[in-house]
Amino acid sequence: MTPPRSTSATSLQAAHASSSRTDEDCILVLQGGGALGAYQAGVFESLSKVYREPTWVAGISIGAINAALITGNPAHARITKLREFWDLVSSALPTPMIHADAPAREGLNEVSASQVMLFGVPGFFKPRFPPAPFQPRGTPEAISYYDTAPLRATLERLVDFDRINSSAVRLSVGAVNVRTGNFQYFDSAKQAIDARHIMASGALPPGFAPVEIDGEHYWDGGLVSNTPLQYVLDQPGKRRRVVFQVDLFAATGNLPATLADVTEREKDIRFSSRTRMNTTNELDRQVIAQAAKRLLAKLPAELRDDPDVLALSSVRSDSAVDVVHLIYRSKHYESQSKDYEFSRLSMQEHWDSGRADMAHTLHDPRWVNHERSASGVHVFDLTADCPSST
């Protein structure tokens, strides 16, 4: 299924061609969120057509899968491969032929989510048989409900890992070491990446078994941190960074009215990325680093080898960071099952919302006209009033 070409996206591409900059790092940061990940694919579609291709993609869980599909293909094929993946995983429940009102849509979504729990997702995972309680103790089959062998086959078919490991587009994915509880990033700038690293980033227990890599076992990175933003901000660099942070769970929300609402709200809070906290910390760090740099320049030469001075001089003082924050905002008929509800209808809605939100952001005068200063951290969250976000 080919996504319809948006006329607004076409006009934006022409209007903002001059805005694309090759003197900056364009970084796409993708949060985990299961079936909601189609939103990220839509964001990427608008980003690549309107602004530019990313130079670095970092992801957790479903964000790691989308990141691999992007970095593991040439620029002209990336949207096609993303579409192929999302069409595959949403193929079990095609779009209904009739328009459904909100109550009916809630019912359709719950049927879809129940089908996933019972039968799995094509090209992604399938139920184990016999079930885990009847499997030999200590085996992967005994500690997970689903088999992710289909995902490995899908990744190896749709992703060129040789391209990832030799490409100028950097890939970073996060997972947690089951034995130590420590977070671990797998980064193509530092090591070879294969399907295991992507699967490890998305191995959420108890649904999926941990993935073994070099004698250690890894679970979904979302258990510790559901976004790689801090990792990206912590890496040294001299060029301006424009970071597009794509979240699938909103930190803010309404007071729950039912137990089902409680479950959904708890999940949103648990997996939301705390982007503002990360960017505030980065701003504070930059202010301190730049003050230290100015102070050191005022010191006489005989003090510049002092250990305390050397320690201060090692504090990074990078160039500016712009963080463009896009957040998927749940539709009123979605529930706590939204991250494992893989119907074709929902997938297409998520994709369309991401595409519209990214286009809206790139067209917003607050983004188009903002001053690109040489230092500091600037945060843009421009989709709260976007029609696709309601």
Which residues does each predicted region cover?
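Hydrophobic/aromatic beta-strand patches that form the interior of the parallel beta-sheet core
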Residues: A58, G174, V242-V246, D322-L326
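C-terminal helical/tail subdomains of lipid-metabolizing enzymes
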Residues: Q135, A142, P150, L155, ...
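Small-residue-rich anion-binding loops in enzyme active sites
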Residues: M1-C26, V169, V176-R179
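A general structural motif
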Residues: D23-D25, P54, A168-R170, R239-R240
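Patatin-like phospholipase
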Residues: T10, H16, R21-V29, G34-I143, ...
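Acidic, Ser/Thr-rich peripheral helices and adjacent loops at domain boundaries
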Residues: A257-L299
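Active-site gating loop/helix substructures
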Residues: A132-K238, Q245, T252, A257-V262
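Short active-site oxyanion
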Residues: E53-W56, E216, V321
